[in-house]
Amino acid sequence: VTLNLDAPFLQRRDANFRPLTPLNFLFRSADVFPDRDAIVYGDRRVTWRDYARRCLKLASALRRAGIEKGDVVALLAPNIPAVLEAHFGVPLAGGIINTINIRLDAAAVAFILEHGEAKVLLVDPQWSAIAREALALLPSKPLVIDIEDDMAEDGERIGDLTYEELLATGSEDDDVVWPQDEFETISLNYTSGTTGNPKGALYHHRGAYLNALGQVLHHKMDADSVYLWTLPMFHCNGWCFTWAVAAVGATHVCLRKMVAEQVFDLIEATGVTHFCGAPTVLGMLVDGAERSGKRLGAPVAVMTAGSAPPAPVLKAAEDLGFIVRHVYGTTEMHGVVSLCDWHREWDGLPGAERSRMMARQGVRTVVTDEMMVADPVTLAPVPRTGEAMGEVMFRGNMGMKGYLKNPSATEAAFAGGWYRTGDLAVVHSNGYIDIKDRSKDIIISGGENISSIEVEEVLYQHPAVASAAVIAMKHDHWGERPCAFVELKVEGSLAAEELLDFCRSRLAKFKVPDRVVFGPIERTATGKVQKFKLRDLIQDQGH
């Protein structure tokens, strides 16, 4: 006899099914840890009880201001308490939160505001000039709210009212808008623009919920954890830590700007246990420690991603007392989807080997359903040889809904039933992936593939090099040749030929760059090198 599991009394009901959403995390922490610090910002401290109350008032105020389900509320602000409040208050009003990259120019901000059809814009005074210029480019202006902040640099008021005035119009007793379907949109995140105009990735409540839990599990956080905001909240909603910290009732420490000495001071003053950031952040901390002589009083866990971390930087960070966890992800997958899950037996490896192992992007997270490295045409997985290269692909609950107003790009991203990252990797015998390049960044010279990351790793090994980026430049005979852009720790401390000699002793001859360009390397706010700008620069110079 077959069991009848489709009987009416066995179907979903309120008692046994609710759409997954990270919004519930806030209220649990307010119930369990009402008087513990939820947010620390300078001399200001906000308890979990008051944090929840302010989020409820924000949701109410937005509804009373005309925000309806599915409306976009944008923010142009650094890592401050108002942004944390908006991550709950906006979706509790039924809205979609859109945190805008604060390093963008006015034209790019205007593009995002118009493309996302933002109904409200919250602005930090330090960015009021950019916001004013962006708003002037729009056919219609959203409701503008000034976030007043004593710690901000001077900036004029451009809004219709202040953030506190907005909150005063709301009530914590008003009803909130819960998602009826966990696939409803919770946020709108624009890609970092390494290839031109950004695309708007739509996140859903289910993905945000699962990724938040995956983060606290893999980052080993609990109610006693103190999380420092060195990672921009506008990047993948701070890799979902805007919600994840609430899941365990930990403490947020807000930071307007990444300054190495200030980070060390905050770690000591507030007992920071965790933070995230691109490898450039690790590099800044290593350099800052060298200048100031600062050290950690206790270990601090760091989750790093954004680009392959150079082995020398990883080793130097560990020597300072940081516990580095290398992760990997994309805007389109709610942030982090894989990590170099560490094996305790690797602790005994020689330093250089440990760093090489840690630089791998590793294996899928506990909430990532499937990951593979495969031929982009046939979808055949590459062998685990550590040599055969393929494209990194994912599928499962972490995938975005799609790109806003861009069906063709959405279909291309999900072609073949997988999300195509465009990253090229090998798979080692233990199943750990190792990204070698972006598909568009691989250098093909005389029919041979040259990994720009491999060349960059060697450049980073030189003690005078602070940062490096390698691109392909056109060559009449070989088709393409490597060109290295290099930032030095001390300007003028190294000659190009000296650096090339260093490379020749560590690389195959055909992989050694033909040219070295010294100077600043332009990056996105999340630490990714904008290689398309470097290519344009070389092309403009006739190379």
Regions found by a protein language model. Name each.
Residues 34, 145-146, 159-161, 168-190, ...:
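Conserved pre-ATP/AMP-binding loop-to-beta segment of ANL
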